[in-house]
Amino acid sequence: MARKQQTRKRRVKKNIESGIAHIRSTFNNTIVTITDMQGNAVSWSSAGALGFRGSRKSTPFAAQMAAETAAKTSLEHGLKTLEVTVKGPGAGREAAIRALQAAGLEVTAIKDVTPVPHNGCRPPKRRRV
């Protein structure tokens, strides 16, 4: 019996001039999501999605590669200017911002939106190595 050929949905190129780059940098990973001004995702990438595993995932180089990958796909959608919001204490914060600038995107503003508790949850105990 003949198989029914699946029709693949093509990615529609959105013509977006400006957007927001959300950089979520934790101690274990860095996730870069580029959205339009309303918050609809245009492209995303992370260190883990690029094949970095274990301790290599939390390096600035992995964050740089994740930002470059997200920037390349957003440039295809016509993105030119970015506002950057950075969240978290990770090692890849500055590396990701520099990679976005190097990819040809103009960074207009950088905001730190790291959530700071008003003495909420107890933090995890200190590591003894």
Curated annotation (Swiss-Prot):
UniProt keyword annotations, A-Z: Ribonucleoprotein, Ribosomal protein, RNA-binding, rRNA-binding
Gene Ontology CC: ribonucleoprotein complex; ribosome
GO MF term list: rRNA binding; structural constituent of ribosome
GO biological process annotation, one example: translation
Domain of life: Bacteria
The UniProt record lists the keyword Aminoacyl-tRNA synthetase: no
InterPro entries to which the protein is assigned, alphabetical: Ribosomal_uS11, Ribosomal_uS11_bac-type, Ribosomal_uS11_CS, Ribosomal_uS11_sf
Function, in words: Located on the platform of the 30S subunit, it bridges several disparate RNA helices of the 16S rRNA. Forms part of the Shine-Dalgarno cleft in the 70S ribosome.
Subunit structure: Part of the 30S ribosomal subunit. Interacts with proteins S7 and S18. Binds to IF-3.
Family the UniProt entry places it in: Belongs to the universal ribosomal protein uS11 family.
The name this protein goes by in its record: Small ribosomal subunit protein uS11
Gene: rpsK
